[in-house]
Amino acid sequence: QCGFINLYGSADGVNCHNTLNDPLDMVLSSVGIPNPSICDIRLMNDRGEEVPPGEVGEIYARGPISPMQYVNAPELDERYRGPGGWVKTGDLGYLNAAGYLVLAGRKKDVIIRGGANISPVQIEGLVMKHPDVMTVACVPVPDEDLGQRVCLCVALKDAGKKFSLQEITEFLREQGLEINKLPEYLRFYRALPLTPAGKVDKKALADDAEGMIMSGQGS
């Protein structure tokens, strides 16, 4: 039997990880605590204020291996560097009751519907509980009235077991998802497209969903 841990890191000098002594549910649901010899972290809101445990914020990091600046790119320093040497990672997360970091997606992926922030990661996690779903991604589609609406992009384990938009929204309601976060469009794929880094290509999915919906082919 072999133990395993979760590790979260980036080129910005972030390093958080579980330990082999952590219970399995903690390993599966979090990325542990910062390695004190590498970095400190803060979770900040859009006003530059540190948020309390349990509340989602952008992950800021600072440590001896954090880059000092971008070379000849002051506009990037303005965007990604904060006072006191803190680096804005663009990742979202929160601290659970044990003080462990739980990731909540990328800040740039947040969907803003009618002024309300919607976390794609939250919806994706609930959809993955459906027995027929293999992979899923939530992407925004533009809307004249609300700014953006939520489109669910799904690859199934068995392509013959498609469900309707109404069926998946009812499933999500049973999982406790708020009404204002329910997806309003549904697209099926044999496999979700990937970036060269092996991550789901949400930009390609968003462009595809927008094109299909504008042409009247979306759900």
Task: Place the predicted regions along the sequence by residue.
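Gly/Ser/Thr-rich phosphate-binding loop
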Residues: 1-26, 39-40
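Conserved ATP/PPi-binding loop(s) of AMP-dependent carboxylate-activating enzymes
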Residues: 34-38, 49-80, 118
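Glycine-centered tight turns that cap/initiate beta-strands
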Residues: 37, 132-135, 185, 191
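Generic short beta-strand
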Residues: 40-41, 78, 92, 191
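Hydrophobic alpha-helical segments, especially N-terminal targeting/anchoring helices
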Residues: 44-45, 53, 81, 89, ...
